[in-house]
Amino acid sequence: MYSLSQRLSVAGWSRVFTTVAGMVLTCAALGHGNVTPQPVDTHTLPQLSSDWLTDNPYSTGSATQEAIRVGSSGFNQNCARCHGLEAISGGIAPDLRRLDAECFDMEESARADCVKTFQAYFIGTVRGGRTRDGRVYMPPFDGILNQEAIWAIKTYLESRRTRE
């Protein structure tokens, strides 16, 4: 049986642990700041029509490097709070560098279909957000980020892709 001083010591350490754990969790939650969307300057990218495309227009071609630059800025201003700086997730939200990683072990025709499926998922998620049981897990960016900005962010993520 423990003496009174031993029980108080255990209770004291338990309170210290609980307090420190609470502070760490609070800092982690608040460390990502608010999620007020920031504008993304896309004037240097080829402008797209008002109809949403199903394929990333910046994945290949002369605008790819500029799209990566614009997308990096857009990602780090709007997405990094949850998905991690430079797209390296800290565990709060999915690591978007791995979004379509499973596609690249497939044969060519299956790979194209897989990439198209993930592009549709990405665009749908960014535009419409994600909620579950009334909780917002990702805010919708439709009407906030234009098509050029969203595809530039996707192009940036493609440049950061990893299979790990």
Give the residues covered by each predicted segment:
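Sec-dependent N-terminal signal peptides
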Residues: 10-23, 89
